[in-house]
């Protein structure tokens, strides 16, 4: 097409304006073409507004720069490219889907390597592998980046860069929950750990599967912190599966000290048979044998349901197997046996008859059940006074509160209090004891005890031992009602070493009967450790 002469005259300035806006590389190419004798054709006259837009695209301004047009700002306010002085905030790192990157210059808004990697978590941008996570029908497709995964996990390294590297672009992982897998990936991308009670066990499994020890340790710490009687048996089963000895030890501490609560929990019925056998064999379970027997029956009923079997005595015996003969039935009292196990129908008539004879006959029959009573746990006592005394008209229980605060340096289980009784002979007291943490009542008991007039303390127990965490102050209180004068403690100590546990004491504002650190009542704390 021949060149229009007008382009060399009236429109030459417009062509020059456009030329000045071109990148240097393009200018050089035009100069090179001119040097070879080629004439550059002006194919289109570009409007000024479009030139401005093209210039903005070719030379993007920095985040703190405005391109101003002094002649057209007012008229083109809605259409001109507006650059903000303040950079938009970076996406939140906890967002589980980062497929919302709008800026082509997103790297500028994330100055650290961790932030930039975190932005790639669960992001399709540059993803070079996808995981189909979860069982069929409940799976989720998760994008990922091989390099980041391989840097954080030796399993992923072998999967992507080892001698038998995976070549498929989609990898199926049916044995890991999607939520747990996302928590694992989030840690590998950003070092962030977001654990919840509902997913922590599944996350521990994923961390173990892909050998990410730091995440596994965080899961174990989370479980130890949230451990209590209602979930201790389930966690014991899982700790054995995951081979976590520290968690196993913590589970046993709770199960031993709070055995009745643990055995009566719903979680106990969810454990596997080997874990059931280990628990029932335990020598240090701190509970009565009829509680153990009832728990075993509850487990058998739940197992029948899991296996789709009718709940009958025969099926219960079958699912229990030898576990039934681990219960120490002969160590029950005769009354406990007669009102419980003897009427359960799970024992044969011959077994029931033999056990009754074992209780009553001089010539006792042979039994298949263990005969030796469990040892349980030996309670320990922390004495906070160095001496005790009594004086006429000195100390009297009149229904007012004696209270003290304490803290320990390791986790224990408070079982009860040791209290002073009458200094004037035999006397009966009604007593209410209470344990609180930050004003919240954790346990209380209302009972009576009889004092014989000596200076020894008398034990008053909570219904169940209460777990007490370290480095936190708790308040114990006792309200006694009686007419007689009582003994009281002197030379109180602010710190007491009791075995491996260190107690610290301080005065309580709840105390209205004179008890404090230096003297008064509540001389003993009874605990398991």
From Swiss-Prot:
Keywords: Cytoplasm
Reported phenotype of the disruption mutant: Embryos show strong defects in late neuronal markers and strongly reduced and disorganized axons while early neural development is unaffected. Muscle development is also affected.
Subcellular localization(s) per the UniProt record: Cytoplasm
GO CC annotation terms, alphabetical: cytosol
Tree of life domain: Eukaryota
The species this protein was found in: Xenopus laevis (African clawed frog)
Biological function: Adapter protein for the cul3 E3 ubiquitin-protein ligase complex. Involved in late neuronal development and muscle formation.
InterPro entries (alphabetical): BACK, BTB/POZ_dom, BTB_POZ_BTBD6, PHR, PHR_sf, SKP1/BTB/POZ_sf
Principal place of residence: cytoplasm
Subunit-structure text: Homodimer and heterodimer. Interacts with cul3 via the BTB domain.
Pfam families named in the record: BACK, BTB, PHR
CDD domains referenced in this protein's UniProt entry, alphabetically: BACK_BTBD6, BTB_POZ_BTBD6
Alphabetical list of Gene3D superfamilies matching this protein: 1.25.40.420, PHR domain, Potassium Channel Kv1.1, Chain A
Limits of the BTB domain: 127-197
Full protein name: BTB/POZ domain-containing protein 6
Gene Ontology biological-process entries: neurogenesis
């Amino acid at each position: 097409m021949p060149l229009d002469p007008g382009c060399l005259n009236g429109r030459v300035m417009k062509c020059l304006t456009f030329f000045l806006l071109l990148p240097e590389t393009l200018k050089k190419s035009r100069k090179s073409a001119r040097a070879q004798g080629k004439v550059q054709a002006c194919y289109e006259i570009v409007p000024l507004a479009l030139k401005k837009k093209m210039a903005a695209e070719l030379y993007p301004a920095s985040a703190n720069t405005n391109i101003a047009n002094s002649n057209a700002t007012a008229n083109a306010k809605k259409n001109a490219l507006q650059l903000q002085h303040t950079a938009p905030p970076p996406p939140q790192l906890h967002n589980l889907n980062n497929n919302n990157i709008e800026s082509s210059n997103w790297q500028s808004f994330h100055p650290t390597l961790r932030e930039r990697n975190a932005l790639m978590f669960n992001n399709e941008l540059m993803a070079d592998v996808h995981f189909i996570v979860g069982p069929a029908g409940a799976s989720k497709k998760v994008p990922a980046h091989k390099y980041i995964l391989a840097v954080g996990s030796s399993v992923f390294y072998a999967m992507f860069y080892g001698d038998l590297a995976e070549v498929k672009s989609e990898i199926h992982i049916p044995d890991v929950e999607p939520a747990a897998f996302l928590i694992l990936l989030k840690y590998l991308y950003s070092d962030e750990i977001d654990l919840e009670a509902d997913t922590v066990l599944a996350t521990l499994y994923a961390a173990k599967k892909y050998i990410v020890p730091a995440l596994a340790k965080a899961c174990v710490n989370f479980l130890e912190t949230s451990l209590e009687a209602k979930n201790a048996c389930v966690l014991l089963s899982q700790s054995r599966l995951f081979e976590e000895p520290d968690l196993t030890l913590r589970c046993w501490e709770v199960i031993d000290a709070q055995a009745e609560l643990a055995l009566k929990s719903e979680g106990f019925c969810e454990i596997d048979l080997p874990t059931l056998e280990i628990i029932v064999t335990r020598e240090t379970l701190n509970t009565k044998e009829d509680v153990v027997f009832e728990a075993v029956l509850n487990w058998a009923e739940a197992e029948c349901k899991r296996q789709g079997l009718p709940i009958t005595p025969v099926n219960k015996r079958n699912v229990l197997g030898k576990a039934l003969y681990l219960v120490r039935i002969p160590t029950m009292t005769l009354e406990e046996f007669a009102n419980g196990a003897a009427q359960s129908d799970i024992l044969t008539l011959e077994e029931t008859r033999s056990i009754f004879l074992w209780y009553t006959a001089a010539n006792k029959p042979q039994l298949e059940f263990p005969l030796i009573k469990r040892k349980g746990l030996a309670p320990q006592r922390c004495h906070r006074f160095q001496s005790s005394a009594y004086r006429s008209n000195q100390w009297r229980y009149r229904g007012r509160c004696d209270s003290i605060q304490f803290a320990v340096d390791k986790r224990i289980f408070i079982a009860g209090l040791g209290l002073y009784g009458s200094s004037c002979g035999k006397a009966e007291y009604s007593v209410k004891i209470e344990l609180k943490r930050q004003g919240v009542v954790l346990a209380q008991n209302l009972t009576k005890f009889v004092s014989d007039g000596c200076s020894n303390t008398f034990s008053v127990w909570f219904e169940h031992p209460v777990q007490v965490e370290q480095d936190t102050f708790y308040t114990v209180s006792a309200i006694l009602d009686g007419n007689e004068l009582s003994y009281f403690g002197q030379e109180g100590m602010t710190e007491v070493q009791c075995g491996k546990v260190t107690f610290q004491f301080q005065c309580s504002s709840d105390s209205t009967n004179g008890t404090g650190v230096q003297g008064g009542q509540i001389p003993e704390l009874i605990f398991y450790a």
